[in-house]
Amino acid sequence: MIPRKRYGSKNTDQGVYLGLSKTQVLSPATAGSSSSDIAPLPPPVALVPPPPDTMSCRDRTQEFLSACKSLQSRQNGIQANKPALRAVRQRSEFTLMAKRIGKDLSNTFAKLEKLTILAKRKSLFDDKAVEIEELTYIIKQDINSLNKQIAQLQDFVRAKGSQSGRHLQTHSNTIVVSLQSKLASMSNDFKSVLEVRTENLKQQRSRREQFSRAPVSALPLAPNHLGGGAVVLGAESRASGDVAIDMMDSRTSQQLQLIDEQDSYIQSRADTMQNIESTIVELGSIFQQLAHMVKEQEETIQRIDENVLGAQLDVEAAHSEILKYFQSVTSNRWLMVKIFLILIVFFIIFVVFLA
């Protein structure tokens, strides 16, 4: 037997009637026609919305205050570290300046070595005067520049000396004095090279005068001799009807040209010697400036010497005190040994005779 299917709008499952929905509201007529065991549904309850001014919140004032305190402590830490950072920056700047001066000193030393090699040459035909003059001028300018840079470095140390520690200031002054001593040594070497160059120029001049003295002394006699020869040649030419060749003008022009070359060479050497003398004078002024700078460092060196002497006296006093303490400890040790021996003797007597 096939069951009968009932079709409904919502309360069906594949055409099978399931019954009334629990949420279905029955009308009064339908309620009266239903069985008596089904209870009527309660009336719908109206939902009351919450008041608009009421909302959930949490007091986070303490968290805000703690965040402010942490930020303030960070700022205070940064401000406390600012002097240290400033000192490190100043130290790096001083190091860079000293490094640059040392590099310039090494470059100038290399140029001075090249000038020394050129200045010690004594040959008349291998004299590179132009290159020597250029190197002399360049080295002189470098020495003046290095002198100014060292003075600026010393002024920097003086300006920042109050902000740095005593040991750091002493170290900086030591570096400045070392650079000054290197510059003074290089200036002294440069002065020695210029003096050698001056002596070589004097020797070359004396040699040139020695080799060119005979032609110059025979120069006044040349026109008369050449004139007599010209007259004889003129008489012979007039007698024979040939053309006379006068050699007076050509020889005179050659001798005059030789004299002009000698004069120009002597003048160039005189100018070179004057330049060398002026350079030596400038080096003397640089030595005076270096002496003044070293004199200013004399107080620091004397203070260091006094500190060394004081430290030596303190070490000697500490050594004497240590010796006294050692003697006292040694005497106390013997006293303790005596007491220990006495106790052992009493213990032996007590054990042997009284036991």
From Swiss-Prot:
Region (Disordered): 28-47
Vesicular-facing ranges: 355
SUPFAM superfamilies, A to Z: t-snare proteins
Topological category with respect to the lipid bilayer: Single-pass type IV membrane protein
Pfam families reported in the protein's UniProt record: SNARE (PF05739), Syntaxin-5_N (PF11416)
Keyword line: Coiled coil, Golgi apparatus, Membrane, Transmembrane, Transmembrane helix, Transport
Motif, IxM motif: chain positions: 245-247
Full protein name: Syntaxin-5
Organism of this sequence: Bos taurus
